[in-house]
Amino acid sequence: MIRLYTAKTPNGYKATIALEELALQYSVHHVDISKAERPEDFLAASPNNKIPAIVDESNPADPISIFESGAILVYLAEKTGKLLPPSGRARAETMAWTFWQVGNTGPMLGQLGFFAMRAPEKIPFAIQRYVDESARLLKVMDQRLDANEYLGGADYSIADIMNYTWIAAAQGYLKEQLGAYFQDKPSLNRWLEVVGARPAVKKGLTIPE
């Protein structure tokens, strides 16, 4: 059994989608990220005090705690032998696009969301800076998907899960800032539709309730 600490965020949904795709048994522990105080068992699993985090209790004598969404998805994929090619070019490209998300779409879209929607003061320069960079990243993805069915190549993988949750969220919540940049991205929109139609993705986006 895997213990999952999560919340309703793009990073949290990465873990629930992966767990659903891999048909792993897990229990959900909803972390209220609006509160400063967090449960001690969560902090033990996530020293950075961020969701998601998991504790793999398959071996009760030696449970394994993992934090950071990219590390979690790689661990789960390697544990099951699914969603991550074992070697060669396919693995290298899947890993590259997995961690491209960690360093690019997550931080840029997250900052755009903060400055456009939550910052107490609107700073036009900051908003435009993150709009421009986010638009560039959408173009990078569209170009990749022009030549490949999925981000890692021919097969659906953790790279798609990692990126999908953020791109789908941006398409919905940042429509005012980025809507126009989705309109001329046929391959990106095709990928969004295909990934979004997967049963595990649909279910993962409902957890926690």
List each model region and its residues.
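GST-like domain detector, emphasizing the conserved glutathione-binding G-site
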Residues: 1-128
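Basic/polar N-terminal segments that are highly enriched at the extreme N-terminus
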Residues: 1-3, 193, 209
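Phosphate-coordinating loops and pocket residues in cytosolic domains that bind phosphorylated ligands
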Residues: 44, 197, 206-207
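GST-like fold's C-terminal all-alpha helical module
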Residues: 76, 98-197
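Short coil/turn segments at secondary-structure boundaries
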Residues: 110-111, 206-208
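Charged phosphate-binding loop/patch that engages nucleotide di/tri-phosphates or the phosphate backbone
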Residues: 194, 201-204
